[in-house]
Amino acid sequence: MAVHRRDVLRGLGGLAGMAAVRTVEARAPVRAGGFPRKDDFLIEDGYTYLNAAYTHPIPKVSMDAVRRAAEKRASLHPPALPDGASGTPKVLFAELINAKPSEIAYVSSTSAGENLVVQALGLHRSTDGNVVTDGLHFEGAILHLLELKKQGLDVRVVKPTKDFRIDITDLERAVDRRTRLIEVSSASMYNGFQHDLKAVCDLAHAHGAYVYADIIHSAGAEPFDVKASGVDFAACSTFKWLMGDFGIGFLYAKEALLDRIRRPVYGYYQAPDMEAFYPPDLPAGAYTPIAYTLQKTAAGTFESGTLTGGPAFNVALLTASLTYIRELGVANIQAHRLPLIRKLQQEVPRLGLTPVTPADSTSGVVTFAKHDIGQTEIPRKLQAGKVNVRIAMHWMRVSPSIYNDMADIERFLDVLS
């Protein structure tokens, strides 16, 4: 059964799809030992955790980094690196998705990033054009758009096909000359369906529209390249495949677009050179309380103030986790996980569950449907067997990661059967 997020936060102490992108060759991990990486995480013996897409465990190396940061914070030592320096989270994340650090802003969550993009594009009324999304997009983003629809915005939701995909031709039928934005998930939270994001972007750009992608199930889980895809905006939290924690995420905004959109928020993080004038330095003439210059960067457009957890802990945690991911190699992470996914796709349907993940998906999740599965004996079996997967009312999602091996999959299958 799935652990509730509030329980995860208590346990951790509250520390703060596309073919062109999936063809990166794997390289040998820098860190010794290969896969699985069981010794890198504090997963208790006898417990099988197959729920990384819900919340990924934090590596030991990152926990150690947070402890050191806490010691520095207790003695009021300043952060070791200024934001933007080599090795900081923005730099590491930008490298991960082939962006510039100046195209990355911190946000509190994926939802916060999506909201900021919609606000920056001025989308909330019937006269603002239309937004196209699909039924496999993140449910929180769909909720946001449906609420805007109540206010008059033209929102068009493309239905999944019978084989649980989004057909590009269905998207094409929904897009027209008034489309301002296409919103999709690069890999669906529900079943791991992966858009051909390059095709989606080509479609949008041909109509003068932008593309926002929720990449929370791509970043860190599969090779992802914002330049190869052509995506205009993308956002993700860090508590899943980036092995971070709640309260901090990343928003990517294409550099060339920053002059075309409006700032949705204002705050002191956007103007690092800001200075206040107080006696005895009051200027002559008209009184100006502060002097500042807003940055023409993603941070200068979308950031406003300190995030949950503060820079001391978040920077330490994400720097360690993103460095760890870089050393292992995302393509290697994906290559290790894929045989586990294929085994699940082969065996679970034999137990009476319907597969809803496309057979060719290379994402980190595999989902199976069964009516009222949440009310069957399956959750009880899994809980008794100390196996953790995501179970909803009518579906079950399994998401192995780098600490899992085929023995974990066999154990899950044994408990399930």
What residue ranges belong to the model's regions?
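Pyridoxal 5′-phosphate
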Residues: L9-S417
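Residues within the helices of the helix-turn-helix
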Residues: R6
